Amino acid sequence: MDGNTYERVKEDYDKLKDNVVAEKKMYKFVKRTVDIIASIFGIILLVPITIIVCILNFFTQNKGPIFFVQERIGKDGNLFKMYKFRTMVINAEEILNRHIEEKTDIGKEYIKNKKISNDPRITKVGKFLRRTSLDEFPQFINVLKGDMSLVGPRPYLLREVKDMNEYYYYIVKDKPGLTGPCQVAGRSNIDFEERLELDYKYVINKSLKKDFIILMKTIAAVFKKEGAI
C-alpha cells in the first residue's frame, strides 16, 4: 500500500464507523434472515450434490476425504473452520510449501498473487467442481452457523494476514462471504492487491442493494464459467 492509498484509508475511517461499526439494525436483520433462508435451501441441495461428488471420485479413483476443512479469518479476526468440497490432491499443502521453500516458479507465483494459475494439484473432479463453483456449496453450512454470509469479503487465510497491511483492520469488521466483490470482478483473474482493495471498498460502502447486485452478478459469472474463485 503506497502513501497516498494509506492516507485515503485513514480518511475513510469515519465513513467506516458509520457504515460498518454502527451498522443499521435493519440491514443486519434482513441480511441475516436472507442468509438463514438461503443456507437452508443450499444445504438441502448439498445432499444430492455430495452423492454425485462421491460417485465421481469413485470412478476417477480420487481417494481421500470428500470435504476439505480449513481455518480462515472471520469477523473481528476470529478463526473459523470453512468447508469446501476437496478439489486438490490430499498432500496439496505439503506440495505448496515445498514449492515456496525451493523458490520454484509455482512458489514465486503463489507468494506474489496468493494463487496459482493452472494449479497442478487440482484433481480431475476438482476442475469440474471449481469450474461450476460447486466446490463452494458446503459453505452454506458456514452461512447457517453464522461464520459467513452470502455476500462479504473473501475468507482470507491466516498466512495472508502479513500481506494485507492496513486493509486487514477494515476487512475483518465484516463476515466473510460465500461470494463478494472479488468474485464478480473477474473472480480469480485479479491479483491480491486488487482483491484487498475491492473487499475494502465493499466493507466501507456495503448495502442491501449492493449485496443483491453482487448475488446476481455471481450467478451470471457461474453460468459464464469465468475464472474459478
Where are these regions (language model features)?
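Juxtamembrane loop-helix boundary motifs flanking transmembrane segments in multi-pass membrane proteins
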Residues: D14-F29, S117, R121, Y156
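Transmembrane helix boundary and interhelical loop/hinge segments in multi-pass membrane proteins
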Residues: N62-K63, P120-I122
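A hydrophobic, helix-centered structural microdomain
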Residues: A22-E94, L208, I213-I229
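Hydrophobic structural segments characteristic of membrane proteins
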Residues: M1-K17, P65, F137-I229
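Short acidic-aromatic low-complexity motifs
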Residues: L129-Q139
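Short, glycine-rich, amphipathic interfacial segments at transmembrane boundaries or analogous
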Residues: Y6-E7, F67-P120, T179-E197
